[in-house]
Amino acid sequence: MSEKKINLLDLDRKAMRALFADLGEKPFRADQLMKWIYHFGVSDFEEMTNINKVLRQKLAARCEIVAPEISGYQKSADGTIKFAIHVGEGQEVETVYIPEDDRATLCVSSQVGCALECTFCSTAQQGFNRNLTVSEIVGQIWRVSHFLGFAKETGERPITNVVMMGMGEPLLNLANVIPAMDIMLDDFGFSLSKRRVTLSTSGVVPALDKLGDALDVALAVSIHAPNDELRDILVPVNKKYPLQEFLAGIRRYIAKSNANRGRVTVEYVMLDHINDSTEQAHELAQLMKDTPCKVNLIPFNPYPGSPYGRSSNSRIDRFSKVLMEYGLTVIVRKTRGDDIDAACGQLAGDIRDRTKRLAKKRMQENQISVTMN
């Protein structure tokens, strides 16, 4: 039986150089190879013309460059493109390309499904299947870059920003997320600025501390409620890591981070008559008073079977004004791609192999009662 080949998309530069040392080659050869893979999108060793033939043959014998395939895509009227990415065994994740006038952001998944069971998120309703590998994470960027034409003129803006805000909780897959983000930041990888790579978390505090020791990227935190009582319902991981513990972890992270410029991005989904009253806005402002931040208010994007509705524009406006009275920077996020279910909270994935999934959790089965504001 032949030995399984090493997928080079699984290796950050440190691991790539270790491989080349094992091959008896100098470190700069690893850097050359990474440029071919990530700057030019080349997966055939024979096309790497500044690498000698003997080394190309060695690489072909032991290694491969394999990214997950795009199995389908939909394009929104606003230019957003949602990709279904096949990651094997009948499994798919979703990756979303969001073009704007001055940038193009790719929203990347870190897991197949999600275990956190946030009650307003469609991905959470599926349960959790597995973590994505490094190659499956960076492969989303690599494959979509191919779709966009890499350096060629295709009419689409090249990817300038990456947000780990797709399917899954990135901090529950640190072993793969950290080297994947290393590749995103590496000059010989995707060469993105650390301020253009954002990780979003719902608050796995010990893993947030580990991230801070390993990497410096922009941080977005999913708060979604101004107190523990409501957040226990909306974001159940709060029962393990309550708000004050989460906020302390956030402050530790931004204290050692340059990417965040001294403040964190707070994400707050606006749920009609659930978390959007003016009283709750005052409560949120008081909650965040010791944590430098800007606040993204996210209009809820309904999905089939969702027990929640989207806050009205007038309620969002009142909520926003209260926060600004406290001196907070507030942005009301423009909904993108909701006509193709690509908006925030709508990534569900067409996953056919569900044998390892948790049973679906439905709000109506839990008999959760939330006080109407």
Curated annotation (Swiss-Prot):
Record-linked PROSITE patterns: RADICAL_SAM
Record field: catalytic activity: adenosine(2503) in 23S rRNA + 2 reduced [2Fe-2S]-[ferredoxin] + 2 S-adenosyl-L-methionine = 2-methyladenosine(2503) in 23S rRNA + 5'-deoxyadenosine + L-methionine + 2 oxidized [2Fe-2S]-[ferredoxin] + S-adenosyl-L-homocysteine; adenosine(37) in tRNA + 2 reduced [2Fe-2S]-[ferredoxin] + 2 S-adenosyl-L-methionine = 2-methyladenosine(37) in tRNA + 5'-deoxyadenosine + L-methionine + 2 oxidized [2Fe-2S]-[ferredoxin] + S-adenosyl-L-homocysteine
Enzyme Commission code(s) on record: 2.1.1.192
Cofactor dependency: [4Fe-4S] cluster
GO biological process, one term: rRNA base methylation
Enzyme class, first EC level, given as a word: transferase
Superkingdom to which the source organism belongs: Bacteria
Compartment(s): Cytoplasm
Domain Radical SAM core, chain residue ranges per copy: 100-339
One annotated GO molecular function: rRNA binding
Something else known: Reaction proceeds by a ping-pong mechanism involving intermediate methylation of a conserved cysteine residue.
Family, similarity comment: Belongs to the radical SAM superfamily. RlmN family.
Protein name as annotated: Dual-specificity RNA methyltransferase RlmN
Record organism: Shewanella oneidensis (strain ATCC 700550 / JCM 31522 / CIP 106686 / LMG 19005 / NCIMB 14063 / MR-1)
